[in-house]
Amino acid sequence: MICCCCDIMAQQDSSTVIGRLQYVYALKDAINDCVWQGFTDKNNDVPLIYYDDSCCYVVNPSKKILNQYAAELVYKDNGVNIYQTRRIDNIPFHMHVTITDEQESIDYHTPIMRCSSLEQTGKTIPDVKTINTWATMIMHEYFHGFQFKQRGFFEAYVAIISDCPQDTLPKFQAQLEWYKESIQQENELLLKAIDALDLDAMKAYIRAFLELRDSRRTKIKELGNTDITSAEQLMEITEGSARYIEYRLYDYLGNFSLAQEKWLYTVGKNYYYATGFNLLRLLDKLGTEYHSRIFTDVTTLEKALRELSY
């Protein structure tokens, strides 16, 4: 097990930052070895920009980043190259992946992970008190970068979101009580399927889940002429798999009980985080391989369940 004893009161200097970034990349290796093979492949590498108070540290920057920002190499070892440069922007908090259509941008059609320091993250999100919590948040977002490195995913994402904007699903959930109730019931059926003790019971819960889901999608299409199927499948894959990485990393780090972390598997304001996460857990229990195709076909999770339900 990898261990890092830094906490939010640690003095922030260059050596502290480099140590934190080394730790993040060691955890990335652990995820590759224990959870998702290919995560550390060179062709899947995503530059990481760490925002300190007065400067930025960039891990494995692209040539475009180095051409746009004067940077000094401050650490190099085992495929991890860390550069220091001026602060790239004045946005107070970062914890996300960016990718744009602007040709002059450093993230033109390629993902870049951006994160604030542990200290700034703790100020913005008070629950973040340890480096493990901070690093797990980073890994959730970094996995989004990994997703966009998969062939065809960016194009599929843009096409689907163009037809059904990302805020559509949360709006339906917030504004339509019947929609919200159906989501809650669907998620409960997924949880029951995960906890089922025999295959027949599991299949019965899966069938009930699919019937309820199909009914909700049909109703929303009839009411507003909106087909949410592809958008829902996309967002469950996108956010569900990133939450799955969080879960597996928490478990790897130890001293973790899923039962006590209900936010991971219960429905929040963006329900597809939980339903997507639970779909992956259910396929794990069924022994279904999905890692190799989940980002090339957004129907992967549901298609697998439909095939296994009878």
Kindly label every feature range from the protein language model.
Residues 1-16:
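Bacterial Sec-dependent N-terminal signal peptides
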Residues 12-89, 93:
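Start-of-domain marker
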Residues 18, 22, 30, 211-310:
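Pan-zinc metallopeptidase signature
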Residues 72-131:
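Active-site scaffold of zinc-dependent metalloenzymes
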Residues 126-134, 154-158:
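Membrane-interface helix-loop-helix junctions at boundaries between adjacent transmembrane segments
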Residues 136-149:
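Active-site recognition of the HExxH zinc-binding catalytic motif
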Residues 148, 152, 285-288:
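Short, well-ordered loop/turn and helix-capping segments at boundaries between secondary-structure elements
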Residues 149-228, 232-254, 276:
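Post-HExxH zinc-binding segment in Zn-dependent metallohydrolases
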